[in-house]
């Protein structure tokens, strides 16, 4: 009798994706982040579901409903901080996952990569709307500043902003619709992640060498299931440590003050995971130019496959490209730091230089260096 997992229509899908899937024998821990992102998404959906049971999306009661969750609901504080810090873990895994893709040339799988870029945008949109929901000072002003950026779009801009707001300012209508979208988007993300996996399994995983691994495959289970479980345990360890010891480490104290449209906080800034893009936005004095730079800072990932000039897929055997990759990482960390600083000298010029370097590295320096490496290797 044939094994049920190989014949049952539902079990067969699970079997071919997580059990009998042929995987390269040499993929490192950098390949763990896909499964970690799946775990993060499950954590976020579950904690979010329980928060939604007690949350009210009304400007008058939103802030106090979050306070009620923390004070009166059984383990409400735990659920709330798991959700807030779970988002931070989500983005840490996302950035490492994308970084791995850039380093090892995973972007050569076009469909998988493009769905991934779409997923990144969807997660960023979800996180932004989630940050608005507690209706603290930074929630309100963050929503006001970021939605206002759309007014830079010629002709339709101001109408578009009022349409998104559902009025003439960020108010009840905005909060209600943001809650609705924040609730539905994670399920769309889950569906997109399924498509992401579907396309990945059409080609099979890449590996650190960037060479074909068809001659040397091993079954996903038990080898990589065990490896993924170790990753998940480490993720949960870091998340619970953060939640139980310093839950507000990555948050903004201003968000513990109820939203007040008449009082602007001295420094409006988003959560840490958006700071690099926020720094790029601020480094351009022109509003439309800043918005374009902001969008392009993420959208530039979609053109990575077309900027690949090397004869080798991975950076494993390309020391010059490796140096440039780590300069790019340092540049992004610099941008993240600048995004959290006030707009004054010397932060302005540092931010502008870091923004120029970011685009120069990706669009010009790295492709030229790859061509140079081809010539050095006489390929």
UniProtKB/Swiss-Prot annotation:
Compartments, record wording: Mitochondrion inner membrane
Presence of the UniProt keyword Heme in the record: yes
Organism expressing this protein natively: Sorex excelsus
InterPro entries assigned to the protein according to its UniProt record, in alphabetical order: Cyt_b/b6_C, Cyt_b/b6_C_sf, Cyt_b/b6_N, Cytb/b6-like_sf, Cytochrome_b, Cytochrome_b_C_euk/bac, Cytochrome_b_N_euk/bac, Di-haem_cyt_TM
TM region(s), chain numbering: 33-53, 77-98, 113-133, 178-198, 226-246, 288-308, 320-340, 347-367
Name listed for the protein in its UniProt record: Cytochrome b
Sequence similarity: Belongs to the cytochrome b family.
Note on how the cofactor is bound: Binds 2 heme b groups non-covalently.
